[in-house]
Each structure stands twice: as C-alpha cells, then as structure tokens.
Amino acid sequence: IISIARLVENKQIKHQVEVIKQLVTKHPNIQLNIYGHGNGLSEYRQLVEDYHLSEHVKFHGFKTHINEEIAKAELMLSTSKMEGFGLAILESLSVGTPVISYDVDYGPSELIQDGFNGYLVPQGDINQMVEKVDQLLNNTQKLQQFSINSIESAQQYNATTISTKWQNILN
C-alpha cells in the first residue's frame, strides 16, 4: 500500500497508520509506504513506534519520480480532509493502482468511481477504510479488475485526449 502526501495534519496520516494497525493481525505482511515530507514526520514516526508497526509502516521522504513506486503498490490510500484535483490519485490510477480515499469535496470523487476503480469512504471513517482495504486484499480478482478499470478511467486525462478536447473547443 502506498501513500503520497505532505506530512501535515490536514492529510490525516494518523488515520492510515490506524488502518494498518487494525489490519496487521489479519494481514501480517501488510506494508504501508509513505512518500512525502512535512512537519508531522516525527509525530507519525512516534505513533508507528508506539503501535509497534515499524516493520509495516515506512517513511521514504519526498521523491520526485514516484510512478515506479506507485506501480509496485496494490493500493493507494488518501485520507486528506480536503483535496483539490489530486495528482497523486490520478498518477496512481494511470499506472493501475486503485485508490481508497475519503470522499471529500472536489478531487477524489472527480477521479474515483466508487466500486469501479477504487472506493470512496466517508471522511474520517477509519473502520470503513479498513473494511475496503481488507475487501481488496482478500479478493485478488476484484483488485485486478479495479487495476484495469483504474488505467481505463485515467485515459481521459492523458495528453492526447486533453489535446483533442482543447482542439475541439477552439474549433
């Protein structure tokens, strides 16, 4: 599982750590790789340590070329309180990594079609996020279908498609 976010309160990284805490017994090989930087890093590291999750939650800092890491992940988590057009979500979908996100205004619901290329869960509902992650980790067929659907849904944002749309508007 991957997360790409600034390590600040608004992104609610604590919620992602809570998700892993609840799933680690059922999924002992679960791994959350968090990419990003911010002033919350020491607090989140301490939380991971307090929960004895150091083997399951890793902080990798900021990375400019992240697509390879996203493509390796089975899922992406987004727990932001508010989100514009989420480029990290779009990048994930474009490489076939489904996203489970809080359903906050704007961004996520523009990109994620609930039950097609990921899941949207109510903002702050950690238990439902746990349930959705568990569902996909337990159902490789559904996970693979979501992956295919992710790539398909991201196609509408590729350069060729956008260029054609602009040409149609300008003509």
Regions found by a protein language model. Give the residues of each.
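Aromatic "clamp/platform" in nucleotide-sugar-dependent glycosyltransferases that forms part
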Residues: 62, 81
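Short hydrophobic beta-strand element within catalytic cores of glycosyltransferases
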Residues: 98-102
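C-terminal alpha-helical cap of glycosyltransferases
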Residues: 159-171
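Short glycine/serine-rich donor-binding loops of glycosyltransferases
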Residues: 86-89, 108-111
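Nucleotide-activated donor-binding/catalytic signature segment of Leloir-type glycosyltransferases, i.e.
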Residues: 45-61
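C-terminal "capping" alpha-helix adjacent to the active site of nucleotide-linked donor transferases
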Residues: 19, 125-144, 148, 167
